[in-house]
A protein has these predicted regions:
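N-terminal beta1-alpha1 cap of cysteine-dependent amidohydrolase-like domains
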Residues: 1-85, 92-113, 118
């Protein structure tokens, strides 16, 4: 399985993702740079975590306007699986590939606590 690992300036989990896809899942990952077109032979795409563009405005908002996102949207229309992890998820929301919006938390500070989630 050919998997594209999208790399933005500030991504810092792309090498970890590449290793897991290659060495654990025995897939064929390839780095896909934010300013280059996606290869046409991909079976899936992963947007890994990190701090794309330093998360200066809102998490993922600048990356959501990178040239590669148009290609990600095109493959999404074809039904090719896309996974966003951490900042990658935020990029998918900011780009409109996932529904909803990202909101600031009540404290306006980083929070690390367990949250219960029910998937319906």
């Amino acid at each position: 399985m050919n998997v594209g690992v999208v790399v933005f300036p500030g991504s810092n989990c792309d090498r970890d993702m590449f290793h897991v896809l290659s060495d654990v899942f025995h897939m064929t990952p390839q780095y896909c740079w934010h300013d280059k077109p996606l290869p046409e032979n991909l079976d899936a795409v992963v947007l890994p975590g990190g701090f794309s563009y330093g998360d200066r405005l809102r998490a993922g908002v600048i990356a959501a306007h990178s040239p590669i996102i148009q290609d990600v949207k095109k493959i999404a229309e074809k039904g090719i699986p896309i996974l966003g992890v951490c900042n990658g998820f935020q990029i998918l929301v900011e780009s409109g590939l996932l529904p909803g919006v990202l909101l600031k938390n009540d404290s306006l500070n980083f929070m690390c606590e367990w949250t219960n989630l029910t998937v319906e």
